[in-house]
Amino acid sequence: MSAAILSMLGRQSAQPWANGSLLVIHPGGGELSALPNASAWSFHAGHAAYWKAAGRPVFCQIQPPNLSHYDGVLFLVAKEKELNQYLLEQLASLPTGTPVWFAGEKRSGIQPLMKHLPAWLQPPQKLASANHCLLFASERNEQVHQSASIEDYAKNITYELNQQQESFVTLPGVFSREHIDPATLLLLQHIKDLPKGRGMDFACGAGVIAKQLASVATELMACDVSPIAIAASEITLANEPVKTELRLADGIPDNAGQFDFIVSNPPFHTGQRTDYEIAREFISNARQHLNKQGVFRVVANRFLPWPEVIESVFGNCSVIADDGRYRVYHATCR
């Protein structure tokens, strides 16, 4: 969660969300775990870990916890519009009269979201505006509505790879929601020479890369920080001949074991900000999980400083593809 939102909430003379049992939706970090009687419904394993460390209840999963257990909800608006719509759908399960507070940065899209709240929520009232952030209040009314499931938001995306039609299933809040991204497509054109053996798709998203790795791997693990991504990958990989172990983790799982290759289109964004530490930590940890002569292969924007980082960690780094915007980097664990 941004410091601006936290500051806005902290400056309110009246903080009704601090009274009674509160569910914080999409917390974006652990800052609000200090609120009395607060629980979190999170979509990021790293953020969930902050709440666990603070000894607070946290649910890092697609489905909401039992909403009847809470006296109020604090909804932190996500930058992904469809994810917000899915989360709003789940609020239909709230008991009538339950207050809902919405907080978010203006650039996250909170204003248009407030203009189009579903009919089962009362028209929102603006409580505060500060530091380019907004705070609104609403509540569940008596209108009956059956919440849509996450499966109702699934999209089947098709694309062409090596003159073959391929597909994957994606869900709200997962990278590459509308189409395959060009960086991933470039990477997929350079995986057939990977060594046979146990492989990993790090930051697997909707399982696009893992699905293609199934043709070269004898055993496969795919991990992601998002439970929604794990659910999308599960659908995408359901009928593949090589069973993939899906892991929800912030980084490479500690007990992941050793691999013959690790492949990724690693993320470098946290919310709306660039965060290079995600990829730096991944590159460092990847070497520890590779067997001798194991292969490390990633795709990234050309402007990112990964060749130097990969070289410093592995002692070697080569470019095996470059389309002018993205490069595929290759290193061997020696």
From Swiss-Prot:
Catalyzed reactions: guanosine(1207) in 16S rRNA + S-adenosyl-L-methionine = N(2)-methylguanosine(1207) in 16S rRNA + S-adenosyl-L-homocysteine + H(+)
Function of the molecule: Specifically methylates the guanine in position 1207 of 16S rRNA in the 30S particle.
Protein name per Swiss-Prot or TrEMBL: Ribosomal RNA small subunit methyltransferase C
EC code(s) of this entry: 2.1.1.172
SUPFAM superfamilies (alphabetical): S-adenosyl-L-methionine-dependent methyltransferases
Record GO terms (molecular function): 16S rRNA (guanine(1207)-N(2))-methyltransferase activity; nucleic acid binding
Species of the source: Idiomarina loihiensis (strain ATCC BAA-735 / DSM 15497 / L2-TR)
Entry's Gene Ontology cellular component terms: cytoplasm
